[in-house]
Amino acid sequence: MAKIINVIGREIMDSRGNPTVEAEVHLDGGFVGMAAAPSGASTGSREALELRDGDKSRYMGKGVLTAVANINGQIRDALMGKDATAQAELDQIMIDLDGTENKDKLGANAILAVSLAAAKAAAAFKGMPLYAHIAELNGTPGQYSMPVPMMNILNGGEHADNNVDIQEFMVQPVGAKSFREALRMGAEIFHNLKKVLQEKGLNTAVGDEGGFAPNLASNADALAVIKVAVEKAGYKLGEDVTLALDCAASEFYKDGQYDLSGEGKVFDSNGFSDFLKSLTEEYPIVSIEDGLDESDWDGWAYQTQILGDKIQLVGDDLFVTNTKILSRGIENKIANSILIKFNQIGSLTETLAAIRMAKDAGYTVVISHRSGETEDATIADLAVATAAGQIKTGSLCRSDRVAKYNQLLRIEEQLGEKAPYKGRSEIKGQA
């Protein structure tokens, strides 16, 4: 048995200079797993709670010593002597110990860090890579694929201090034959975008996720400069490379309207969906995430009606990796894809349940980082293990982002043909 003999929590730093939670799970026999919880900037209101201390004298209230104390106390006591390979049982023990709907007693950051650390310790005990262990937990052993990266090369919204309203402008190297080639294509486009911005006298500082964050006259201008960068890199837009947006529309939804203050436009719900549709007609945008506010379900129904059979409509704040909310979306035919962020729900077991529910309903799955990240690369293993098909982990800059890409390179090298890169067919509506 992979007997747990110690659980340790500590406060570490994330990529934005804020504290986050790291956990270690130690097993009999010297096996150890270590994992860290990420943190979001644009967060859905129904996400599991990230427990912060609120003590303004430390880290402006963002300390996580309470969550760490919960790991070193109640969680450790509850898990001592348990089998680390019994992931669902461990996660349920922590969920029951917390006893709240959104994990606000122990903190989703505490529970998640321990959940992932236990999975890593169990993989070490079994003598297998983390992705292989997660695939077994998922009931899909040996069924792997390399994900198409959604590379956030131009940032706006909550991820940047500029006047661009849409939060993320991404490229997807759908024409690549392997993940390694996809990564190279993305890097070449990223460097060419820097040159394009410099030639225009625009800022080349980067945002939270490593993408450039210039001031531009409109959101369409962001697409225009990316188009030039793709062509300068020697690729065909729409053929080799497609585009994706994360609107994070909840961030500019005010009093029932969508206020694009950066370009001085205000839309009602259907009007904003029509605006997005017009962008898809001008550019090869094949995926739009959070194109409306998380509570605007009538608007989502309209957006799905006009765009859902043509492109991928991804629910992030809409679904918050929560099977209860996702099942309602499936029932009402809202969106056709889900973004998976395991700190939105707070455990590996619940994350895998959301992935299975989405796939069973014919929704696509995009595994995602958060804007506040660490060097922890667990999402790379998760994407391959579940054959999710797509991953969103930032730009080709900042080691907190590149750590995930490098782990995917290692995994592809290990698995070879057992983990195919399927490109365009992974994206809803593009097969």
Swiss-Prot record:
GO MF annotation, one: phosphopyruvate hydratase activity
Keywords: Cytoplasm, Glycolysis, Lyase, Magnesium, Metal-binding, Secreted
Residues at which (2R)-2-phosphoglycerate binds: Q167, K341, R370, S371, K392
Keyword Lipid biosynthesis recorded: no
Subunit structure: Component of the RNA degradosome, a multiprotein complex involved in RNA processing and mRNA degradation.
Homology family: Belongs to the enolase family.
Name this protein carries in UniProt: Enolase
Species this protein is from: Shewanella loihica (strain ATCC BAA-1088 / PV-4)
